[in-house]
Structures are given as C-alpha cells and as structure tokens.
C-alpha cells in the first residue's frame, strides 16, 4: 500500500510539473458528408446557414471523431440505412477535411463491416473462418495498412481507438467474452496488442484509446481494465460511453470516474460517446425512454442533461475529453437514414443548432 501511495504521489507531481493534459471537446460527425451530399442545410441558433466545421470551431470544439469500418459494402441493408458507409476512402477524405480545418483527429476503428457495439462485434466477412492467431494477424495488417494510407495522405490522428465499445470483446465469436470474469481476455488482449503494435509503429505519437461502455457499472469497468493491466495491454487512455438511457445516473458516473482515478491514476479518461434525446419522432429506439423521469424527452430535457453532465465532468481532473455521438443528425427533407434518433445537436425539422450545444461547450 505504501509503494502504491508513493507511486500515485510521484505521478501527481509529474503531472503538475508537466502541466495538465490538453482537454478535448468534439463530436463524432462521421455522417456529415452524406448529409451535405443530400443538400442538407445546417443553421446556427438564429437560423442562419453555417458551415458545420467552422461553427463547431466557434463553439469551442478542438477535436473530431471519425469512424472506420473494414468493408461496409458487406453490411446488411438495415445497417446501410442507418448510415454505415465509412470505408477507408470515406474516412480518409473526412479526416483530411477535419485536419485542414484545424481540428485534432480521433480515428475510431471498428474491426467489423458495420456497427461494433455491446450487442454485436461481428468479424469482417473477409476474415471469417480465421483462427485466433490469423485474426490477430489480420488486425495488425489492417490497422497498419489503414494508418499507412492515411499517413501517406498527410493525415496522422492524434488519437486512435483500437475497437469500439469492446466491453464484450471483439471479432465474435472467437473474441467474445464475459467482462465480469476472466475467460476470453487472453484472446482479446492478443487482438488489442496486435492493433496497438501497428499504431505504435506507424503513428508513434498518437494516443491509443481502449473504449468500453459500462460507465455505470464500476465492478465490470474495474475488472475489465484490471484484466488489461495484468496482460500488459499497451494503451494510453480509457475511453467510455455514457448514455443516460443505458448507463445510470450522472452521480453514478462520477463515482466510476473517481474510482478510475484512484485505481488507474496513470490513465486519463475520455467520454468518447454521449448523447441524449430531445424527441422520439420517427425514432426506431423510441422505447428507450426509461430515463424520462430524470430528463424529459424534449429540447429542455436534452439541455438539462448536457448541463448536468458537463458540470460533473468538470469536477474530475482525470477526464480529458468529451465527444457527442452523431451531433450532425439533421434529417428533414432527406433520406440519409431511414429513421431519426433525435439525439443530435441540430433540430431535425429546422436544421437549427439546439440549446444543448451551448451547454456542451462549457466542458473545460
């Protein structure tokens, strides 16, 4: 215990001496080019047309998250209708635009042909039939080749996610695991080590993020990152998703953040995904309103949630990033997606920026 206390004290001194790490504010805008191609107009709070990236910059954003799928052409039609289209060419073009606009880049690699999340982490079609070592080799080769392609185009991400919401593993069924136990972590960590090795080789200055989504479950979160520590996984930042409809209350999130700071003081934490509803119109997830008793499903409820979340995060010095997921949703007069999620930061009917955008910008 004394050795651990001394280590934490020395680490704190080092942080003071070197200055606090930079804080990132931004969003995952991976569908923005598709909306723009459909003729979608984005507007500021007063209804005046805007260029989205310039507006985000004006609102204090300094980073953008871009997702990358392996071969989205193999995605089921239902997922294509949800906006799955981000192959390497798409991600590269958007990333170049992001960097040219002066933002730092978080590249979010989904090791799947479509959505990778707690309920699905399916192996890319072209990797099916591989054994666990062949899958690890594929992770390494794909990560390395993708980063090399981006680097040749002059794009080096400041941050790279090796996997997306991989609480339950990745590359199912081979890499599936129970995050509350120990089984499966050896295979998962071999996959992670392969991806991280490629990141270190091609983009040695990039920060590596390992992203899970059980922000409201401390026991699972603790066990998960302890298992990674035991296996010497090489990463820099703990990434969490936090959605109020799935992950508990904001005070509960605060306890998780405090505990992470105590147990993993060397690892900054980022909320790499958050969002909240302002409506349920045309929403395929409309049943996800079990949190309405805390935050009404309304513009005011979304604003209240954002204000309270930012207030909580600003209390935690170990939290160095906050990203809104799908802020660019703007569905009026287009069919970019089949339904509306109504969790973005622009009104689906008017294209106007929502008040939650102002509250979001208070993360400091």
Residue locations for each model-derived region?
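Aromatic-rich peripheral "rim/lid" segments of glycoside hydrolase catalytic domains that contact
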Residues: 259-266, 279-312, 316-364
